[in-house]
From Swiss-Prot:
Residues 1-18 form the signal peptide. Glycans are attached at residue 214. APOE is an apolipoprotein, a protein associating with lipid particles, that mainly functions in lipoprotein-mediated lipid transport between organs via the plasma and interstitial fluids. APOE is a core component of plasma lipoproteins and is involved in their production, conversion and clearance. Apolipoproteins are amphipathic molecules that interact both with lipids of the lipoprotein particle core and the aqueous environment of the plasma. This is Apolipoprotein E. APOE exists as multiple glycosylated and sialylated glycoforms within cells and in plasma. The extent of glycosylation and sialylation are tissue and context specific. Glycated in plasma VLDL. Residues 269-320 are annotated as: Homooligomerization. Belongs to the apolipoprotein A1/A4/E family. Residues 212-293 are annotated as: Lipid-binding and lipoprotein association. One of its GO terms (cellular component) is extracellular space. Residues 281-293 are annotated as: Specificity for association with VLDL. It comes from Cebus capucinus. Heparin binds at residues 164-167, 232-239. GO terms for biological process: acylglycerol homeostasis; cholesterol efflux; cholesterol metabolic process; chylomicron remnant clearance; high-density lipoprotein particle assembly; intermediate-density lipoprotein particle clearance; lipoprotein biosynthetic process; melanosome organization.
């Protein structure tokens, strides 16, 4: 009899332990690397649109089970689609803006950079589409399990969304790196333009000297000092004009670079705060469930121990 009780107890405890581990699993979310947290920083329109996409998805996920089942409908999928299209539209617009700044760069370099950026853009779009597909799949499974417990489905959805979130972070990191290469190419093109102006200016100076020598020999009747002064004034005016254009172009490039950097830093801070808020909400979602399961587990163990102790207590004998 004792052997039978022990076997039943072991089987029961093993089943309870498996269930507890299955429910607790969604809470275990790995910490993000520092560079991944920094990726959600920047102030470009496409990154702000991506933030709205993820905020909407997080809003759906944090609702109660009943409200969540009501919202997981075709309307939610349509709204996610609209946010995805907005993100990709803003990203294409920003890419076109950078391509305009790459005009001085060689055609081969422009083609290579454009191809790499398109690949990163496609990966981001595919991962966003995967998020929408996972949500639609969850909706179908919930509808198929009406009247049954959906804790396992919610845990599985949370696990999928956590993995997809990390993939989105990697996509944003890759895109920002590609865009940084674009910006570097724009600066390189501007520097090449300045070098060309300097070379042209040097050529003009040499031509001016040669022409001055020729004119000086042909106009020997004019006073030498008067001719040199007039030619020097014309050359000085020409050099000042070219130098002014060069400075204006350099200032314009510097302003554009500073503006892009400021936007990147601003969005980086926003993305980091969003990531921290998302992590805090996930923790607050699953923490009460874990504590409740632990209390139930402790009570169950006490009851089983009490039952086993009662069954093994020897019965007093009436024989003296």
């Amino acid at each position: 009899m004792k052997v039978l009780w022990a076997a039943l107890l072991v089987a029961f405890l093993a089943g309870c332990q498996g269930k507890v581990e299955q429910v607790v699993e969604p809470e275990l979310e790995p910490e993000l690397e520092p560079h991944q947290q920094a990726d959600w920083q920047s102030g470009q329109p496409w990154e702000l649109a991506l933030g709205r996409f993820w905020d909407y998805l997080r809003w759906v996920q944090t609702l109660s089970e009943q409200v969540q089942e009501e919202l997981l409908s075709s309307q939610v999928t349509q709204e996610l689609t609209a946010l995805m299209e907005e993100t990709m539209k803003e990203l294409k617009a920003y890419k076109s803006e950078l391509e305009e700044q790459l005009s001085p760069v060689a055609e081969e370099t422009r083609a290579r950079l454009s191809k790499e950026l398109q690949a990163a853009q496609a990966r981001l779009g595919a991962d966003m589409e995967d998020v929408r597909s996972r949500l639609a799949q969850y909706r179908s499974e919930v509808q198929a399990m009406l009247g049954q417990s959906t804790d396992e489905l919610r845990a599985r959805l949370a696990s999928h969304l956590r993995k997809l979130r990390k993939r989105l972070l990697r996509d944003v990191d890759d895109l920002q790196k590609r865009l940084a290469v674009y910006q570097a190419g724009a600066r390189e093109g501007a520097e090449r333009g300045v070098s060309a102006i300097r070379e042209r200016l040097g050529t003009l100076v040499e031509q001016g000297r040669a022409r001055a020598a020729t004119v000086g020999s042909s106009l020997a009747s004019q006073p030498l000092q008067e001719r040199a002064q007039a030619w020097g004034e014309r050359l000085r005016a020409r050099m000042e004009e070219v130098g002014s254009r060069t400075r204006d172009r350099l200032d314009e490039v510097k302003e554009q670079v500073e503006e892009v950097r400021a936007k990147l830093e601003e969005q980086a801070q926003q993305m980091r705060l969003q990531a921290e808020a998302f992590q805090a909400r996930l923790k607050s979602w699953f923490e009460p469930l874990v504590e409740d399961m632990q209390r139930q587990w402790a009570g169950l163990v006490e009851k089983v121990q009490a039952a086993v102790g009662a069954s093994t207590t020897p019965v007093p004998s009436d024989n003296h």
